[in-house]
């Protein structure tokens, strides 16, 4: 737990070398935002771009899919920067071929647009199985 984009970049070769992926799905960035170094949205984007470029260089035809940062109730104070990071990564991916931005935030909201707390464990950070079932419905169409 607690993985950050810096970890993906550090371990990129170990993570990627054993495979010849047709698709790389990335869910990372939430822990970057809340880490003690408190990076800006621009810095988190920079870290993402570094990993993106590593994947793209090694596997030029692989589809790269990014799963948006979720808005955990326990991290509500960070939602504004998380929203900025999501927008920056989404905008970046729009300029690249063979990419997807998978927005899982909307499916986690109730009918009033508020984050559903009932899909989270007591810590209000990690999800219950119901939360992951919602993600599955959103993500499945993107899987290659």
Predicted regions span which residues?
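Sec-exported extracytoplasmic/periplasmic mature domains
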Residues: 13, 17, 29, 53-60, ...
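Membrane-targeting and insertion segments and their boundary/processing signals
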Residues: 22, 29, 37-38, 60-63, ...
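A short small-residue
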Residues: 28-33, 68-70, 116-119
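Charged, glycine-enriched surface loops/patches
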Residues: 43-67, 88-99
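Catalytic His-Asp segment of secreted/periplasmic serine-dependent ester chemistry enzymes
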Residues: 71-144
């Amino acid at each position: 737990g607690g993985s950050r984009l810096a970890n993906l970049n550090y371990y990129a070769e170990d993570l990627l070398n054993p495979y010849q992926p047709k698709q790389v799905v990335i869910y990372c960035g939430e822990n970057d935002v809340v880490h003690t170094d408190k990076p800006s949205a621009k810095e988190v984007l920079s870290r993402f771009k570094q990993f993106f470029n590593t994947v793209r260089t090694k596997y030029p035809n692989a589809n790269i899919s990014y799963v948006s940062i979720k808005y955990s109730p326990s991290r509500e104070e960070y939602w504004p920067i998380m929203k900025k990071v999501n927008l920056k990564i989404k905008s970046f991916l729009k300029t690249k071929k063979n990419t997807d931005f998978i927005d899982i935030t909307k499916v986690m909201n109730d009918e009033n647009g508020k984050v559903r707390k009932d899909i989270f464990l007591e810590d209000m950070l990690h999800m219950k199985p119901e939360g992951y079932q919602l993600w599955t419905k959103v993500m499945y169409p993107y899987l290659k």
